[in-house]
Amino acid sequence: MIYIYNDFGGTHTTMMAVAYHLNQLPQSERKLTTDEILNIKYFNKLTKEDFGKLIFHGKDEDGHSVYTIGRRSQDLVVPALRDLFLLLHDKYNFDERIVFSNTSPTVPFPMTMGGFFSRTLKINSIGVPLLVMGAKQCCDNVFRLVEYTKEVGKSNLGKKVVVLNNELFKS
């Protein structure tokens, strides 16, 4: 199975989700510390050149591959990737199940503003504190989203491709 966490930029909640998924963060709903947030690999590190790139982060405890993608528009990238994977399944005997999990609903307003200041305007002195504030606000939701994503991945065995929009995790 392949898990692909995705959102607009691919560098904040997606990286938090990967860190939870790969047991690099405490496996609980407790609030993260500033150091834990800032030490998440790739957190606030990706640039616009990274949009649309599938980034491999490792294999989980069950041996499943975990990726992220900054997709800008969910209306284009995720459906295109879903159709590509279905084509590979049908025509070329590609045998991996794919779970796309959208982390965008977990993004709180401070994180949106922090991403804008830090990634777009390059004003880290304003952006990073807002990102940390936002990450602390949403970390429990991101943790629950990851747990849900894993459950769905294990339970939807008949589906080749699963797309989770995750609106129930809205911040």
Segments (PLM) and residue ranges:
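Non-transmembrane, aqueous-exposed alpha-helical and coiled segments at domain scale
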Residues: 1-4, 12, 16-171
